[in-house]
Swiss-Prot record:
GO terms for biological process: innate immune response. Residues 23-24 form a propeptide. This is Bomanin Tailed 2. Disulfide bonds join C33-C36. Residues 1-22 form the signal peptide. GO terms for cellular component: extracellular region. Secreted immune-induced peptide induced by Toll signaling. Has a role in resistance to bacterial and fungal infections. The strength of antimicrobial activity appears to correlate with the overall level of expression. Keywords: Disulfide bond, Immunity, Innate immunity, Secreted, Signal. The lineage of its organism: Eukaryota, Metazoa, Ecdysozoa, Arthropoda, Hexapoda. The gene is BomT2. Belongs to the bomanin family. It comes from Drosophila melanogaster (Fruit fly). The keyword Lipoprotein does not apply. InterPro entries: Bomanin. It comes from the Eukaryota.
Length: 76
């Protein structure tokens, strides 16, 4: 495997891992949510109590897509 393929594979891996682990709509600075999607005191917006379990299926699907993309990139 060429060095350029290794570099491309690692770059693909790290970019996709950053996308999988990102929490959309929330920016945390010093432990406080600065840019959250939920406005203060708005009872009409319901947020699941456990944010990590709510998107576990999409994380699983994205992880499988990452694995397939890396294997395809290595062998092509």
């Amino acid at each position: 495997m060429k060095a350029l393929q290794v570099a491309g594979t690692l770059m693909l891996l790290f970019c996709l891992l950053a996308a999988v682990n990102a929490t959309p709509g929330q920016v945390y600075i010093n432990g406080k949510c600065i840019d959250c999607n939920k406005p203060d005191n708005d009872p009409g917006i319901i947020i699941p109590p456990d944010h990590k379990s709510a998107g576990s299926m999409s994380y699983t699907l994205t992880s499988g897509a990452i694995f397939f993309g890396i294997i395809y990139h290595i062998f092509s």
